[in-house]
Amino acid sequence: MQANGAGGGGGGGGGGGGGGGGGGGQGQTPELACLSAQNGESSPSSSSSAGDLAHANGLLPSAPSAASNNSNSLNVNNGVPGGAAAASSATVAAASATTAASSSLATPELGSSLKKKKRLSQSDEDVIRLIGQHLNGLGLNQTVDLLMQESGCRLEHPSATKFRNHVMEGDWDKAENDLNELKPLVHSPHAIVVRGALEISQTLLGIIVRMKFLLLQQKYLEYLEDGKVLEALQVLRCELTPLKYNTERIHVLSGYLMCSHAEDLRAKAEWEGKGTASRSKLLDKLQTYLPPSVMLPPRRLQTLLRQAVELQRDRCLYHNTKLDNNLDSVSLLIDHVCSRRQFPCYTQQILTEHCNEVWFCKFSNDGTKLATGSKDTTVIIWQVDPDTHLLKLLKTLEGHAYGVSYIAWSPDDNYLVACGPDDCSELWLWNVQTGELRTKMSQSHEDSLTSVAWNPDGKRFVTGGQRGQFYQCDLDGNLLDSWEGVRVQCLWCLSDGKTVLASDTHQRIRGYNFEDLTDRNIVQEDHPIMSFTISKNGRLALLNVATQGVHLWDLQDRVLVRKYQGVTQGFYTIHSCFGGHNEDFIASGSEDHKVYIWHKRSELPIAELTGHTRTVNCVSWNPQIPSMMASASDDGTVRIWGPAPFIDHQNIEEECSSMDS
């Protein structure tokens, strides 16, 4: 506006100069023209001004400067007719030129930013889909929609989404139609590769039939629960039976027609009933037949996190707590690490009531008592305090003239059998509750009864020794069965109630069946087997082998799994044990006065416990208190091991030296 007055003066002074500039005589700078255009003081009201704007914005090819500009175009303030249009055109042209210039600068940056947007990798897309599925399960549907929109990913195939919704709504006809839409996706080669864990013999057509069968089965059960027997019968006859799949299951389904009420149906079918729970389970089964590119497996993120936590626990050398698959019980923000101070490698108590070498120790099955046998001819039963985990003397069982070298608790912990060394022909059966001797058994003065094991029924036990005796007896000491010529070193009864494992003088472990009187070789070593014990599941055997140490065998595959290092094992009988939660650990005494502890998967010891002054003959891990362990030694003491207290750190380091493997 103020520039227009200056333009008028310039025009009066000399129009030729303005013509030479091809528009410079308009007397308006580009900056002011842009400002005027932005303020709405001039607008492209003619076709020429619109064309100039189009040229400036690059929408049309550039045209040469107009030669018709003259001094008349400067008379906008002088009221000259037609001057306003020319001035307006010039103003817009200048503004457009400025806009074009700025656009030419901004456009490359915008294009560059678009080009710089990172393309998601396959793993990134997988993570986004996993997060989306998890959020969806939490009900954060809007968040999932925004996540998928911004990332450009797809949570699942649209046909799979329809299928899911129709299954959860119980719209079985539509769900069956959706299944037909999903058929090409199931038949794709990619689907075959992803489902590699399924049986190879399954044909693609068979997969569709199986999925359809599951759908119709749910439909049938829901009809029955609703009392629509005729509709259910129609599904059974006209839809399920023609599939010609799993006829045995169809016979079972037909039997549900006889159920008188819904509760009876749910009980017999082991089915939650019509609703979200049963349909969700159905959907989980159906998802296993679809490739993850179409529909993610159920709760996939939780599955991966659970696997990660389990792997960390497996790799933790000192993990000795109950395995909990609930992710809420652990922190996902840090790695799982157990402290060695939580491990039973600190002496909590020293029991000194025996007055000679202690040859054996064994916790009861319920973990409330400990029995120790000694050369001093006594068995002492100790009570475990459930709160302090300290032991106090409960009973002393006397009269074992040759000493006590082996003890076995009955399955119900009501009885205890004690054996002596090689030259002992007697066996004592004690009532633990009363402390009374129920049976003192001896078949012959020439017998050697050095080992004993209880049958799982608690009514029988087997015993034997190195002089060729191998008997099965009842609680009164009556002989039930016997094997001749078996020189027994150690015994164990398997959970089947029929098979007895026995190590003998031929450096082997054989299985003896007392029902059909058959036997078979299971383990063969190259050196004498001094003792052995079996894991709770009956799969693993832990052997103390003369001059070799501790060996772990797989009884099912009959292979040597691992040889544990560090222990000193000569020809003394040393008893090792499984222990800890899930029996992940192995402990053994040693002739170098130490107790060695290994993680089951590691050959090197994770702890060496010192304190005894002579050979450690036996170690027993409390089956109910994973942080408690007992060791018996020729030094006449029994040591109780537990976690370290929160003080006395120096003594902890001295008594528990650890080596990570």
Curated annotation (Swiss-Prot):
Cytoplasm as a keyword of this entry, yes or no, is yes
Q: Which GO terms describe its biological process?
A: proteasome-mediated ubiquitin-dependent protein catabolic process
Impact upon substituting residue 254 to R: In SKDEAS; uncertain significance
Q: Report the locations given in the UniProt record.
A: Cytoplasm; Nucleus; Mitochondrion
Question: What InterPro entries would the database entry show?
Answer: CTLH_C, LisH, TPL_SMU1_LisH-like, WD40/YVTN_repeat-like_dom_sf, WD40_repeat_dom_sf, WD40_rpt, WD_repeat-ST_regulator
Found, by tissue, as follows: Broadly expressed, with highest levels in heart and skeletal muscle.
Under the subunit heading, UniProt states: Forms homooligomers. Identified in the CTLH complex that contains GID4, RANBP9 and/or RANBP10, MKLN1, MAEA, RMND5A (or alternatively its paralog RMND5B), GID8, ARMC8, WDR26 and YPEL5. Within this complex, MAEA, RMND5A (or alternatively its paralog RMND5B), GID8, WDR26, and RANBP9 and/or RANBP10 form the catalytic core, while GID4, MKLN1, ARMC8 and YPEL5 have ancillary roles. Interacts with DDB1-CUL4A/B E3 ligase complexes. Forms a complex composed of at least WDR26, a G-beta:gamma unit, and PLCB2. Interacts with AXIN1.
Indicate what this protein is called per its UniProt record: WD repeat-containing protein 26
Organism, by scientific name, is Homo sapiens
Q: Which gene encodes it?
A: WDR26
